[in-house]
Amino acid sequence: SSLVGSEMCIRDSFAGLPPHYTYATNKFSAACGTTFATASFFKNGAMNLKVGILAAIGSFAGSALGAHIVLMLSDEVLQMMMFIILPIAAVIILWRRNLPDENRDDGTLNLKKALLALGIGLGIGLYDGMVGPGTGTFAIIAFTSLMGFDLRTANGNAKVLNLASNYASLFTYLSSGLVVFPVGIPCAISNIVGNIIGSHFALRKGAKFIRPMMLVVLVLLLGKLITDML
């Protein structure tokens, strides 16, 4: 979960909760886990902090907007939205699963790169606030394909972006009283453990670990789509 996020796995643990409560409680759990994963990548210097912060600013705004949109939608619309978006997400991950693991970034930060980082954060943050599954993988794809980072650094940048988007959505849901803490706290503990373990392997193994995990995300997305159809 430190690589791709755990939205699709954890939401299934909230069976019986209305969709809005599921979104909110899941976001609490995800925010807790992502905090520890981000700390691990920061400690190991596996991120471009300037790019990560700019992306986080965009992500915070996008995710807050996405969460507010979710609150305005009915349960039926939310379920239909997931049904439409998940197969599209799966296709994108399948198409871009074999990402190059080379750092083509020259280390400078000009206006073009700054705006690109903000744009990546805004777009992925909006997706995370409204949908969630695969957010980390989409961020890695964006940072490698559009900004030329290697997989390890792209993963670290994605952590900063995802941290901001998680907390932006969480603050929105907390203000609406939608987080079910008796359910969310045990899931948060599991999420933290998973993120710590996942970060350890991602940092040590790099692309050898990250690429297979992207395929795992694809399988989980497709699996969720199939189960939702049944």
Question: Language-model segments: which ranges?
Answer:
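Transmembrane alpha-helix interface/packing and boundary motifs in multi-pass membrane proteins
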Residues: 5-6, 122-131, 169
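Single conserved hydrophobic/aromatic residue that forms the stacking wall/gate
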Residues: 1-5, 9-10
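Small-residue-enriched transmembrane helix starts and helix-helix packing motifs
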Residues: 110-126
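Transmembrane helix exit motif
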Residues: 36-46, 83-109, 222-230
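Extracytoplasmic gate region of multi-pass secondary transporters
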Residues: 135-137
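Selective hydrophobic functional segments
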Residues: 24-80, 84, 166-216
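Membrane-interface alpha-helices at helix entry/exit sites of multi-pass transporters
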Residues: 17-26, 50-54, 148-159
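Transmembrane helix-loop junction
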Residues: 13-14, 21, 67, 71, ...
